[in-house]
């Protein structure tokens, strides 16, 4: 079996027990490179469609991602090509990113997190975890997910139409990118909806850049009437508008889910899918080295933020992205930031044995519980 895989995917070694694995640059992959490959493993930077696959021998496509907007699923079905992806693989990493962003933004505003009103837009694997964690912080969480609502959702998060949630203190986006249908999410936050947000509010986007009209957002931020904003995703990435970067509180190069555990879990889910499809291979599993315990006390929001930053500092990614914009080729620099991203662990990699005030016990329990 011949497998072509994005070189930025870790944990590909188990495939080598039954296949030849060829690692390639996912963003620049061409049909000619596919050759006699049976399996193609990608990330979100590779557009998988008829133009790439027609005439190839590829019989299985796997994407180590939550979203599938980069894959033409209709074409794969038409061509009889099996498909698998990795829903929820990096949900914890994204939730940790959002939690840190919330704490940073609240600190900037001098606002306590407890009692703040949050709108979680999209209640998939990531959105549900974010909603649960922010609820554990004592925040008032409501959600928007019309597809889930139509299925008779009866979960712990109260649902409401998006337009009824635009007065929330914090709006965090966790939807797939879709450009058609009754509930399309392209420019879900368009100029009209953005105009209803003000500087006392906070906006976080970690799903897909085009979910927000970036030009309209930039114009509103320039006028001084826009919300405090954190963007991990950009409508024109890998090109990041320098003006918009300067306007947001924090920006990063589409890495919210870039924990080592999340990446390995995504690859492992594809490994299991390929094994099931091909009848080859054995159950996967990647052992992590034992990590030293963490024991700082958590008695305040500042303590919780400091604990999160043991694993990851959002400010570091903001700085690195800003530096990349001065490169002679900022788009290539954006990709390099992702390709050479520092190893980042999720908090549950460590064992926590510090003292915790009762106020923070629920969130600490969630952060360190095993998968």
Swiss-Prot record:
Biological function: Catalyzes the oxidation of erythronate-4-phosphate to 3-hydroxy-2-oxo-4-phosphonooxybutanoate.
PANTHER family: FORMATE DEHYDROGENASE 1 (PTHR42938:SF9)
Main location: cytoplasm
Gene: pdxB
Compartmental location: Cytoplasm
Positions that bind NAD(+): 145, 232, 257
Protein name from the UniProt record: Erythronate-4-phosphate dehydrogenase
Organism: Alcanivorax borkumensis (strain ATCC 700651 / DSM 11573 / NCIMB 13689 / SK2)
Catalyzed reaction equations: 4-phospho-D-erythronate + NAD(+) = (R)-3-hydroxy-2-oxo-4-phosphooxybutanoate + NADH + H(+)
Subunit structure: Homodimer.
EC numbers for this chain: 1.1.1.290
InterPro entries: D-isomer_2_OHA_DH_cat_dom, D-isomer_DH_CS1, D-isomer_DH_NAD-bd, Erythronate-4-P_DHase, NAD(P)-bd_dom_sf, PdxB_dimer_sf
Pathway membership: Cofactor biosynthesis; pyridoxine 5'-phosphate biosynthesis; pyridoxine 5'-phosphate from D-erythrose 4-phosphate: step 2/5
GO biological process, one term: pyridoxine biosynthetic process
Organism placement in taxonomy: Bacteria, Pseudomonadati, Pseudomonadota, Gammaproteobacteria, Oceanospirillales
Similarity comment: family membership: Belongs to the D-isomer specific 2-hydroxyacid dehydrogenase family. PdxB subfamily.
Chloroplast keyword on record: no
Highest rank taxon of the organism: Bacteria
């Amino acid at each position: 079996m011949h497998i072509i895989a994005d070189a930025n995917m870790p944990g590909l070694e188990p495939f080598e027990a039954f296949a030849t694995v060829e690692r390639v640059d996912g963003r620049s992959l061409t049909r000619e490179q596919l050759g006699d490959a049976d399996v193609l493993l990608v990330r979100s930077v590779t557009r998988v469609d008829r133009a790439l696959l027609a005439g190839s021998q590829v019989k299985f496509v796997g994407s180590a991602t939550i979203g599938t907007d980069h894959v033409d699923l209709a074409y794969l079905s038409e061509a009889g090509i099996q498909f698998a992806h990795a829903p929820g693989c990096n949900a914890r990493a994204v939730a940790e990113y959002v939690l840190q962003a919330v704490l940073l933004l609240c600190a900037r505003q001098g606002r306590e997190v407890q009692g703040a009103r949050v709108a979680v837009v999209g209640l998939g694997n990531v959105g549900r975890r974010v909603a649960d964690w922010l609820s554990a912080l004592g925040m008032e969480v409501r959600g928007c997910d019309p597809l889930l609502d139509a299925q008779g959702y009866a979960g712990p998060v109260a649902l409401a139409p998006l337009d009824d949630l635009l007065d929330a203190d914090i709006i965090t986006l966790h939807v797939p990118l879709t450009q058609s249908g009754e509930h399309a999410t392209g420019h879900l936050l368009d100029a009209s909806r953005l105009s209803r947000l003000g500087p006392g509010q906070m906006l976080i986007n970690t799903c897909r850049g085009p979910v927000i009209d970036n030009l309209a957002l930039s114009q509103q931020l320039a006028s001084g009437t826009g919300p405090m904003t954190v963007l991990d995703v950009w409508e024109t990435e890998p090109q990041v508008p320098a003006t918009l970067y300067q306007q947001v509180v924090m920006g990063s190069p589409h890495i919210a889910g870039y924990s080592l555990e999340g990446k390995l879990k995504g690859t492992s889910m594809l490994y299991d899918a390929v094994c099931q499809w091909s009848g080859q291979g054995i159950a996967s599993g990647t052992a992590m080295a034992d990590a030293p315990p963490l024991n700082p006390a958590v008695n305040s929001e500042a303590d919780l933020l400091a604990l999160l930053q043991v694993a990851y500092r959002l400010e570091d990614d903001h700085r690195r992205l800003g530096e990349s914009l001065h490169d002679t080729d900022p788009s290539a620099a954006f990709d390099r930031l992702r390709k050479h991203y520092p190893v980042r662990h999720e908090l549950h990699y460590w064992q926590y044995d510090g003292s915790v005030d009762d106020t923070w016990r629920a969130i600490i329990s969630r952060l360190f519980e095993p998968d």
